[in-house]
Amino acid sequence: QCELKEEQESWDNLVASTGWDRVVLVGGEKKSEIGKNIQEIGEQRGLSAEECMMDLLLENHGDAPIVFYSMCQQDVERILWSPESIVISDALYSEEGLPHPRRYGSFSHLICTYKDQIPIEKIIPKITSAPAKRMGIENRGSLKTGFKADIVIISPEKLKDMATYERPRQYPEGIEFVIVNGKIAKENDGKGASGFFGHLIV
């Protein structure tokens, strides 16, 4: 518990830089505590935040997923403006608890938030062709002859990010079709695909 309060040489102590009030529990067996920060849960239990985190880990057999509110918006925007920057999502997939809203709304959030500051024709390459090129993924990320037909058809005027930290499992509005390898994987009317059309890229 003492180590949780101090910076460490062997691992990054995000708590030391953010504070327990910016560490939110997003999963676990006690549903009433999901969505609350660790400091708040600790106060309700009559424990220090460090003791509370230890108890949560024990109660959930080591699986107590959390979200850190540690980003500086000014830093994010300064990097985003760079022509060399790309945007990806590292959202984790789970059927339980509250996933990070980026799992459902990363790219719609990006477009909706910055469409008045960055032309959409400059935003789209940051989430398609540029990441594919950076990762060395051939034949994907662009609408070109011979490339895989991975296509998202959107209505820009209808596009709206719906995912929030409180209600993250919401798909964005305004996405008409998602096409994977030339086959329709998702339609805006809620109709899903009859199969899985993607494959592992290594």
Language-model region placement:
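C-terminal cap of metal-dependent C-N hydrolases
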Residues: 78-84, 89-90, 101, 151-199
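Acidic, glycine-enriched loop/beta-strand segments at the rims
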Residues: 64-76, 120-124, 132-169
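Flexible loop/turn segments at secondary-structure boundaries
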Residues: 59-63, 93-98, 131-134, 160-162, ...
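Active-site neighborhoods of metal-dependent hydrolases
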Residues: 1-113
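Gly/His-enriched, cation/cofactor- and phosphate-binding structural elements
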Residues: 106-133
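Short beta-alpha connecting loops at secondary-structure transitions
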Residues: 94-96, 113-116, 162-167
